[in-house]
Structure formats: C-alpha cells, structure tokens
C-alpha cells in the first residue's frame, strides 16, 4: 500500500508518498491546483513506478480548496480519503519538533492514514451539496440583512428618533417605502399630505391611510433629531433601504430554489415540531447521510451541542457548557427548532419546563431541549419515518 499525503492550498498543493511501513517513497513536492498540476502529480507516481491500484490519496478538508482535486481523483477511480485538520494537529503533537510547513504537513497527512485512527470527511450527493451551498448562502444574506438593519436604526436614532414609534415593524413594506422616499423629518414634513397618503395607501395595500400620514408628519414636525448633515443622512438611509429590498429579493429567490430541492428529497424531517422547510433544509444539508453517525450523541458532537466534560481526579465539573466545536450552521438551525418546539411540542414543552423548575436559566434549558431535539432528528432520519409527538409518563433527565 502506498499513501499520497496532500497538503491543500488555494493555488499550489504539496504532496509526499509513504508506504505501509512509513518509509518515504517520494519526498515532498509541489504541484499547482490546475490540470497541468494534476498531470504532474500522476507523472511523479509513474516515475516512481508505483502501481496505481495500490495507491491511496489523502488530504485535509481545507476550506473548499480540496473539492476540485478530490472530485477529479474520484472521477478517475482513485481511492481518496479526506480528514479533518484537527486530526493532523493531533499527530503533530506527538513529535518533539512541532514544526508546521506544507511539505511536513503532506507527510503528516499520510501518517494519519497509515495509523488508521481517523474519521473521514465525505462529499455529499450533488443535491445535498447544492442544498448546503444554498442554505449557507442564505445564512450569509440574512446576516447581511441584520447588519444593514442595525445601520438604518443607528442613523434614524440620530436624525429621526421618533420614527420607530410609528410602526410596529420598522422594516415593513410601508415603512420601507417611506424610508426610500422621505427618510428625514425635513423631507417628510415638507412632502404634500396627499402624496404621502397615496404612498402609504399603496405600500400598505390600503391598511394605512390619511391618519398614518398625519401621524408621521406630526412626528416629523416635532422631531428632536440631529438637524445637521440632513442630506447625508437621507442618502445613507435611502441606499440602505434599497439594499434591504435587494437582499429580501435574493432570500426569496434562494427560498424558491431550496423548496425545489426539498420536494425532490421526500424527507420526513419537516414533520418534526419546530422544523419547517427552511430549517429542515439547513439541517438536512449539514447532516447529509445520517448513517455517518452511529448514535444521536455522535450527531450532537458534530453539531457542537454536546457538553464539554471537566474531570480531574475526584473532581467532576457540574457547569458544563456546549462544546460549540461542530457545524455552526447545524447548531444554529437546531437551536431555532428547539426554541420553537418548547412552545408547541408537548414532550419538549414539558421537558423544558422541568429544567426551568430545577432552577436552570432559560438559555440553559433551551440547550437541554436542543439535545432532545437532536435525538428526535436522529431517529426520524435513521428510520425515515414521520415524527409523532407524544407526552411520556416520565421525562428522563
């Protein structure tokens, strides 16, 4: 057996080859992350006269840079193993000189495979991979929305602090129409009342009319906001409001694409209380093949909601926190699902209340509910059966 350890980088990879005894067969060499580099990799193996059916390739899951080489090797029939960088670091700690260089890392990656104590990262099926990219992209855009909203609020707090009292939701369609047209007290108070009333009536679908227009102009005339740099504040608020509209359209487009993929999967995950199509997509795309996990505890560790253990001698930690070492996207989705389920699912609601009655804070109680939610998700995905809520006679701790 020959192991090709590859240290992945953006433009240039480093590779080295060892045999089953750990003897270096090919010293570390570099090759570019393109077709000519790939050909150089194969040429180096051919030069060493290595039988390709006895060669195994190993690489770290470094960002997204490993995907192109991984898929090319797999397509051509090679055995490829992908490991977590944490596992390479654990091997490095055994060496007295814990140097980190690309050539040395290529050898370390090969050694990890030779020792056999590793868990492989896998490339999900294409539809799951597409779903994951969409969900992560959606998460990024929603984060942008939150950031832009904070900027709008900060500007309005300075120039028009009374504005937030006019709407239950400052970012409703009606409010956004006003922020894109007349966002400052001066512009709002000087706008003809009839024009303002028409704008409000159209944007609110006739929910608001003259009374809301009069209320807004009264607030504008009596505003205690910062009077300087009005043109700049107006420009910034208008631009941010238009940016929010654009981001909102992008989220809708992503949601449509996510829904299309979810329809093809025919999954029972959305039968779980607290998990709708969007959260279900996040969870499915991050987990992938549930058979990768032998237990719900392994899935909890992957999500990073397993408790950290603190033990030394006779000491056992009693205030253990979430490890938060797994997928942040999966952890966030499970947290949202559990937060909803403790309000609507009979068993989780009772379990959550039990933890609250024990004196645990709200967030800690939701954390316990998250671990129960993981068990439910694991069982539903493992058995591929719809979830049936129930109230147990006794709720286990």
PLM feature spans:
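A detector of single, family-specific signature residues
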Residues: 1-397
């Amino acid at each position: 057996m020959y192991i090709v350890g590859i240290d992945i980088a953006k433009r240039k990879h480093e590779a080295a080859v060892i045999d089953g005894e750990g003897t270096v067969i090919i010293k570390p060499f570099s090759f570019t992350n393109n077709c000519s580099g790939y050909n150089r990799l194969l040429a180096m193996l051919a030069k060493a006269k290595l039988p390709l059916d006895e060669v195994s390739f190993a690489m770290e899951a470094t960002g997204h840079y490993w995907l192109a080489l991984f898929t090319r090797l797999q397509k051509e029939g090679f055995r490829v193993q992908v490991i977590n960088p944490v596992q390479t670091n654990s091997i490095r700690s055994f060496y007295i000189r814990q140097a980190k260089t690309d050539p040395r890392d290529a050898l370390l990656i090969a050694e990890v495979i030779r020792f056999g104590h590793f868990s492989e990262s896998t490339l999900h099926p294409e539809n799951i991979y597409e779903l994951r990219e969409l969900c992560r992209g959606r998460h990024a855009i929603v984060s942008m929305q939150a950031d832009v909203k904070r900027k709008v609020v900060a500007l309005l707090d300075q120039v028009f602090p009374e504005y937030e009292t006019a709407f239950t939701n400052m970012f409703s369609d009606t409010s956004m129409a006003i922020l894109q047209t007349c966002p400052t007290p001066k512009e709002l108070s000087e706008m003809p009342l009839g024009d303002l009333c028409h704008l409000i009536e159209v944007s609110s679908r006739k929910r608001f009319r003259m009374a809301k227009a009069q209320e807004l102009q009264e607030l504008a005339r009596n505003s205690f906001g910062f009077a300087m740099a009005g043109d700049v504040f107006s420009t910034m608020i208008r631009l941010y409001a238009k940016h929010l509209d654009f981001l909102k359209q992008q989220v809708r487009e992503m949601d449509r694409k996510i829904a299309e993929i979810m329809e093809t999967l025919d999954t029972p995950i959305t039968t779980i209380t607290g998990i709708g199509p969007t959260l279900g997509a996040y969870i499915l795309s991050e987990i992938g093949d549930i058979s990768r996990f032998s237990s719900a505890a392994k899935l909890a560790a992957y999500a990073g909601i397993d408790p950290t253990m603190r033990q030394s001698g006779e000491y056992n930690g009693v205030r253990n926190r979430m490890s938060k070492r797994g997928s942040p996207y999966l952890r966030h989705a499970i947290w949202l699902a559990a937060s909803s389920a403790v309000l609507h699912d009979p068993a989780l609601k009772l379990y959550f209340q039990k933890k609250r009655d024990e004196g645990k804070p709200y967030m800690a109680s939701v954390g316990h509910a998250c671990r129960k939610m993981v068990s439910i998700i694991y069982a539903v995905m493992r058995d591929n059966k719809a979830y049936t809520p129930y109230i147990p006679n006794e709720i286990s701790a």
